[in-house]
């Protein structure tokens, strides 16, 4: 029953963790164990510049996720260009459309960018959020029915 809740909590945690990833150095630091380090296009530096964060799993050591659009890519090859792969698979990513460094944005520009990042999160995880809300509503309804049944010593038929 709580699988949607767990996925929702994990997704929100990722959204919060990634708010610091506007900083190139923070993104780069996630690539400490990246399998491609030299003589290739997908070096840690190039991956971080393209907005990626290294999110390895036990079975997939080369998973990279854009901190902005949350697009996850795996199966990297040495000749894969991070910018090209990112734009092919997430052309509407707000990070890709930046024309200047985040530090050079006005406060208004940065807030608009952050609002776009949060919208991307909700687009990606809206079904998880909806499932979580539905599960919580069902559980709350059940608790209320049990409470009122016990208070008034009657049974309530939900199928009517």
Swiss-Prot record:
Q: Which GO terms describe its cellular component?
A: chromosome; chromosome passenger complex; cytoplasm; kinetochore; midbody; nucleus; spindle
CDD domains membership: BIR
Positions with a binding annotation for Zn(2+): 66, 69, 86, 93
Which processes are annotated in GO (biological process)? cell division; negative regulation of apoptotic process; negative regulation of DNA-templated transcription; spindle assembly
Major subcellular site? cytoplasm
Query: One Pfam family for this entry, by name?
Result: BIR
Keywords, alphabetical: Cell cycle, Cell division, Centromere, Chromosome, Chromosome partition, Cytoplasm, Cytoskeleton, Metal-binding, Mitosis, Nucleus, Phosphoprotein, Ubl conjugation, Zinc
Q: Which residues carry this modification: Phosphothreonine?
A: 43
Q: Which PANTHER family match?
A: BACULOVIRAL IAP REPEAT-CONTAINING PROTEIN 5.1, DETERIN
Q: What is this protein called?
A: Baculoviral IAP repeat-containing protein 5.1
What is the native source organism of this protein? Xenopus tropicalis
